[in-house]
């Protein structure tokens, strides 16, 4: 995907947030399947897609925040082979918010291949390595997927497993796929406190012991902006990979 096209998508997504979604008033109403949907990112994806009038179905284990969306169709299953609830159904777009292990992603991808129009996979900026350099673009080298027997998600395996999941989706769907690589996602519902801690601590004043220097670039994306972009991807179905983060620069 050319950078100009990516900027156009991000600009339109930002406009959605700014004007309450009215920019998409004339867009086609889609049947969207969200794999996951009840963690940190998912509820924001649901809100953004509902604002566009799209018909949503969730597929998850029913363990995280059960009953959060009683007004939505929720199919209960498991990515590790318990996919019967998805059989015989069709959707326009799938948003994969719960893919971490290539083998499991392959199972879902194969099952849905002939029953959907487009697959959007939520990956991570971590595929580039632990400390990505400034100015990365979507064609830069990513981590090497681990041996197929490695399925435990840890700090050491996360990047490679996510990169392996990307390979599965791109090889299965080709131009019918979108890979979104968010940087650190922040905003309402984030339980990690990995970003907000520093903002609050600095606001309190006094000396702060912190890693790095004040000149280090800082990259993140507000979960609501990410959700608006995901909606745009669902509606436009662009092929390719996208880094989802703030514009370049340092924050002080």
Please provide the spans of the model-predicted regions:
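N-terminal export signals
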Residues: 3-25
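N-terminal Rossmann NAD(P)H-binding glycine-rich loop of SDR-like oxidoreductase domains
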Residues: 35-52
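NAD(P)-cofactor binding segment of oxidoreductase domains
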Residues: 89-146, 164-166
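Active-site Tyr-X1-5-Lys
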Residues: 149-179
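Alpha-helical substrate-binding/gating segment
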Residues: 200-208, 216-250
